[in-house]
């Protein structure tokens, strides 16, 4: 007869107070043979089978009506491979016992995970299709150090938390279990009895696929294969290359006209990628595509950091979308949100009954602006979770760059908080030293592990050294959004032209700090929502002037030092604000050729000109790549500057932000010669007035602006022109 455990030990197993079911269940050596114990609620009969032969060895006794069975295999001393033949109420089944398998995490993984230096924790945590002892199944692992019990529940066990309690690895707080027979595509969650005895159902933080709202389960999905980074894609991210970014919200770029439903990843891989290629953009930036519960967050409140949203298809479909962009020569940037997460009950919040992923003190852990929770960057395991996620997208999906959202909210403890609502750091300051250390660590990891991939920061303050390396006391980003330039120049453009002379410095101020960081000039989604109006509608004047102003502004922007970013719809001057719940206004491009077509053609030509003319990009971050020619003509609201490449090639941009054409306008130049007009935003081609310079101008030895030579040009009304110096 089998030796039964104490009744209270069995009770602990069923009540959820047993953190080590493996000490009780499975096969164990005993004086009289091998003891076999099984937890099979609702089973009526259980036999032990020899796996190799399928022979019945012994029937297990039902020692507890709740489903505890045991038996002794006499005269056997060495554990062997076995199975159970289980009779349920209406069918019979042969199953492998999950409690006959050993520990899953290797010692080195356990050490690195606890230390917070495991570069790829997603390779060990989560749900992984595995084969152990020639048995196929899934290895589950989840971090919940303060839980009393964790069970895997899903379609495969009737969502019954009694059936498959997990083993706790006390050295790192990770619960693990290999479940034979579980297959790809099956739904699962973790049933957690937390430190207070409350039962919670949690999605897997490391799930590679998740259900779309309103459903919340995780899906067993293979870990995507690594995507190699090509030299061409690495080179396209360099500081001396043209970078023109098309920012896109996949759910509202274009929709099916019959039912207003989203395009799939497959449809976007054709329609969107072809469009971006035709328009001349070099990069596409996706608003967050991590699984998220609330459409109105635009993806910026993700709960499935490792799972591409199923709104548009499967993870494999998304990977194909990225590959399609790469085949078209377009790099993919992903908006990444390591700053906060929503408090939905099935997610990370209060994961094991404690503030595990978030700061416990709401003065540190609650984000008042978004009603979300802030990651506890001081915990090794949280840093692992986030930094590993960055590498996951870069390596497993071939993403070329990550744009980190809301950096200022991460690095300042008093961000959007009044006095008394925040906790100073160890030194009494307002910097979140843990978040700063996390960002530096992540950026260093990206640089070492994925050469050629880059990170971009949306940082809204003047925090110093965002794009300096950590060893120079910087944050280690490659690029930073220049939000100051964007605000200043848009404020200028909103002024009536008659008043612009009083705001002249708003267009020039950006050059005073242009070389302090590696800047991207962003006209992003944030500028066309929440009552700010569309970019077109911000322009003053009648319809003709609005479009002319916008074209002139784009011309100025594309010539200005800094990489370019434009949100979808702005490239054809959509007239209304962006609405995440409907398609862009593509009907504006239907019918007869009009002003919207003109702006679209201009942006296309600007992008192609930008890529073809090295002076416009090669020395974006070097002072010798830029020279003001006309900087102080307030009265005429005219600006002129020269751009230079490494070989001395020169391109002059001249902008007139009044509706008055400037004929015979003389500009002092540094190098005499003949200049060809290669772009004019006032061209008939763009629905302008077609005022210009008949293709070229020639310098004269007439002093102006402190220079010996000058050119006399016609600067069209509300327009920007590009003049390329011909080779001599």
UniProtKB/Swiss-Prot annotation:
Keywords noted in UniProt: Carbohydrate metabolism, Glycogen biosynthesis, Glycogen metabolism, Glycosyltransferase, Transferase
GO cellular component labels: cytosol
Active-site residue numbers: 405 (nucleophile), 458 (proton donor)
GO molecular function per UniProt: 1,4-alpha-glucan branching enzyme activity; cation binding; hydrolase activity, hydrolyzing O-glycosyl compounds
GO biological processes: glycogen biosynthetic process
Protein EC: 2.4.1.18
Database matches in InterPro entries: A-amylase/branching_C, Branching_enzy, GlgB, GlgB_N, GlgB_N_E_set_prok, Glyco_hydro_13_cat_dom, Glyco_hydro_13_N, Glyco_hydro_b
Top-tier EC class: transferase
Catalytic activity reported: Transfers a segment of a (1->4)-alpha-D-glucan chain to a primary hydroxy group in a similar glucan chain
Keyword NAD: no
Taxonomic superkingdom: Bacteria
Family to which the UniProt record says this protein belongs: Belongs to the glycosyl hydrolase 13 family. GlgB subfamily.
HAMAP family assigned: GlgB (MF_00685)
NCBIfam families cross-referenced by the UniProt entry: branching_enzym, PRK05402.1, PRK12313.1
Function, in words: Catalyzes the formation of the alpha-1,6-glucosidic linkages in glycogen by scission of a 1,4-alpha-linked oligosaccharide from growing alpha-1,4-glucan chains and the subsequent attachment of the oligosaccharide to the alpha-1,6 position.
Name of the protein: 1,4-alpha-glucan branching enzyme GlgB
Organism expressing this protein natively: Serratia proteamaculans (strain 568)
């Amino acid at each position: 007869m089998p030796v039964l455990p104490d009744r209270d030990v069995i009770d602990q197993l069923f009540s959820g107070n047993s953190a080590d079911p493996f000490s009780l269940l499975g096969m164990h050596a005993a004086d009289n043979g091998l003891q076999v114990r099984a937890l099979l609620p609702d089973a009526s009969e259980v036999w032990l089978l020899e796996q190799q032969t399928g022979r019945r060895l012994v029937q297990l006794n039902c020692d507890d009506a709740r489903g505890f069975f045991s038996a002794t295999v006499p005269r056997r001393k060495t554990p062997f491979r076995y199975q159970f033949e289980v009779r349920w109420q209406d069918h019979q089944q042969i199953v492998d016992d999950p409690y006959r398998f050993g520990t899953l995490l290797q010692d080195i993984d356990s050490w690195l995970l606890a230390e917070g230096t495991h570069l790829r924790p997603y390779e060990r945590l989560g749900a992984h299709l595995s084969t152990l002892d020639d048995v196929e199944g899934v290895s589950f692992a989840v971090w919940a150090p303060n839980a009393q019990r964790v069970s895997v529940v899903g379609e495969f066990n009737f969502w019954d938390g009694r059936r498959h309690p997990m083993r706790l690895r006390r050295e790192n707080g990770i619960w693990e279990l290999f479940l034979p027979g579980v297959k790809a595509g099956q739904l699962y969650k973790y049933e957690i009895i937390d430190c207070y005895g409350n039962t919670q159902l949690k999605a897997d933080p490391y799930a590679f696929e998740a259900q779309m709202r309103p459903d919340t389960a995780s899906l067993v999905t293979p870990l995507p294969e690594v995507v190699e980074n090509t030299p061409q894609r690495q080179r396209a991210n360099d500081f001396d290359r043209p970078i023109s970014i098309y920012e896109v919200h996949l759910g509202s770029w274009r929709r099916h006209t019959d039912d207003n439903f989203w395009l799939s990843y497959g449809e976007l891989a054709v329609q969107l990628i072809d469009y971006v290629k035709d328009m001349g953009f070099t990069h596409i930036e996706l608003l967050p595509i991590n699984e998220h519960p609330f459409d109105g967050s635009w993806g910026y409140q993700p709960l499935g950091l490792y799972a591409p949203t199923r709104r548009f298809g499967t993870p494999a479909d998304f990977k194909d979308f990225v590959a399609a962009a790469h085949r078209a020569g377009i790099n993919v940037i992903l908006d990444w949100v390591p700053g906060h997460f929503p408090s939905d009950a099935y997610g990370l919040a209060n994961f094991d009954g404690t503030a595990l992923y978030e700061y416990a003190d709401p003065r540190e852990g609650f984000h008042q602006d978004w009603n979300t929770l802030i990651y506890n960057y001081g915990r090794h395991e949280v840093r692992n979770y986030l930094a590993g996620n960055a590498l996951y997208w870069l390596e497993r999906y071939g993403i070329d760059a990550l744009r980190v959202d809301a950096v200022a909210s991460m690095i300042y403890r008093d961000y959007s908080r009044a006095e008394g609502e925040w906790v100073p750091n160890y030194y009494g300051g307002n910097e979140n030293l843990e978040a700063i250390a996390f960002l530096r660590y992540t950026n260093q990891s990206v640089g070492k592990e994925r050469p050629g991939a880059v990170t971009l920061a949306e940082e809204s303050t003047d925090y110093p050294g965002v794009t300096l390396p950590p060893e120079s006391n910087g944050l280690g980003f490659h690029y930073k959004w220049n939000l100051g330039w964007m605000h200043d120049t848009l404020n200028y453009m909103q002024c009536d032209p008659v008043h612009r002379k009083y705001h002249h410095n708003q267009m020039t101020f950006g050059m005073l700090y242009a070389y302090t960081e590696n800047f991207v000039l962003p006209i992003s989604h944030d500028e066309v929502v929440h009552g700010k109006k569309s970019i077109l509608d911000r322009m003053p004047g009648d319809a003709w002037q609005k479009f002319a102003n916008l074209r002139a502004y784009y011309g100025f922007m594309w010539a200005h030092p800094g990489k370019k970013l434009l949100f979808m719809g702005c490239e054809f001057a959509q007239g209304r604000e962006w609405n995440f719940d409907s398609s862009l206004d593509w009907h504006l491009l239907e019918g007869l050729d009009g002003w919207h077509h003109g702006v679209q053609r201009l942006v296309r030509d600007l992008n192609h000109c930008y890529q073809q003319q090295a002076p416009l990009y090669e020395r974006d971050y070097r002072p010798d790549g830029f020279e003001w020619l006309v900087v102080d003509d307030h009265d005429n609201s005219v600006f002129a500057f020269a751009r230079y490449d490494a070989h001395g090639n020169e391109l002059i941009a001249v902008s007139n932000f009044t509706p008055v054409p400037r004929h015979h306008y003389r500009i002092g130049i540094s190098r005499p010669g003949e200049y060809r007009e290669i772009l004019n935003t006032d061209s008939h081609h763009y629905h302008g007035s077609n005022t210009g310079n008949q293709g070229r101008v020639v310098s004269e030895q007439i002093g102006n602006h402190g220079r010996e030579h000058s050119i006399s040009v016609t600067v069209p009304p509300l327009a920007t022109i590009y003049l390329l110096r011909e080779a001599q």
